[in-house]
């Protein structure tokens, strides 16, 4: 269990430092920092919703849902007898990412996003679209954890 909590803490700390950089540096740069022209930049954004900026619930509902999921995930790992490295990594990524965004919601009332891949911006069927959202380290942790869960389900839950 110690490894799980330490790894979760590492993901939270990395996310916090990255978001502090976004707040202290990127917020004052309207065009962000271009790392690969026309493709990848760091750019400050405030996300009031959940994934892809969707606002399916009011802010209080999102906060309560995030708290419930984090508590449920912590409880599940606690009662599980599975201590395989892949199990610990997968759930530490998901919990660390979830708690990283939860901390933002508690402090700021929104999530700080700053990683932007400019895959396509333009008109599609007469409507302006941007095909990739701005995200953060916590979102990446959740996504990587979910992908591990999907692709390595049998290895995670049936370790040898």
From Swiss-Prot:
Active site (catalytic residues): 113, 139
Function per UniProt: This protein specifically catalyzes the removal of signal peptides from prolipoproteins.
UniProt-listed Enzyme Commission number(s): 3.4.23.36
This protein's name: Lipoprotein signal peptidase
Keyword Transport attributed: no
Catalytic activity: Release of signal peptides from bacterial membrane prolipoproteins. Hydrolyzes -Xaa-Yaa-Zaa-|-(S,diacylglyceryl)Cys-, in which Xaa is hydrophobic (preferably Leu), and Yaa (Ala or Ser) and Zaa (Gly or Ala) have small, neutral side chains
Family statement drawn from the similarity comment of this UniProt entry: Belongs to the peptidase A8 family.
Entry's localization field: Cell inner membrane
Domain of life: Bacteria
Principal location class: membrane
PANTHER family recorded: LIPOPROTEIN SIGNAL PEPTIDASE (PTHR33695:SF1)
NCBIfam families per record: lspA, PRK14787.1
Pathway(s) this gene product operates in, as recorded in its UniProt entry: Protein modification; lipoprotein biosynthesis (signal peptide cleavage)
GO biological process: proteolysis
Species in which this protein is naturally found: Chlorobaculum parvum (strain DSM 263 / NCIMB 8327) (Chlorobium vibrioforme subsp. thiosulfatophilum)
Membrane topology classification: Multi-pass membrane protein
One GO CC term, this protein: plasma membrane
């Amino acid at each position: 269990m110690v490894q799980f909590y330490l790894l979760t803490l590492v993901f939270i700390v990395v996310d916090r430092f990255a978001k502090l950089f976004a707040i202290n540096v990127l917020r004052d740069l309207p065009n962000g920092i271009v790392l690969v022209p026309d493709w990848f930049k760091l750019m400050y954004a405030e996300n009031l919703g959940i994934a892809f900026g969707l606002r399916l619930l009011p802010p209080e509902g999102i906060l309560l849902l995030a708290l419930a999921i984090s508590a449920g995930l912590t409880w599940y790992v606690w009662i599980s007898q599975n201590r395989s490295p892949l199990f610990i990594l997968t759930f530490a990524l998901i919990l660390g990412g979830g708690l990283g965004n939860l901390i933002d919601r508690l402090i700021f009332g929104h999530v700080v996003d700053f990683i932007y891949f400019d895959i396509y911006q333009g008109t599609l069927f007469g409507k302006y679209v941007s095909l990739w959202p701005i995200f953060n380290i916590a979102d990446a942790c959740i996504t990587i954890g979910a992908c591990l869960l999907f692709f390595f389900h049998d290895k995670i839950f049936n370790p040898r």
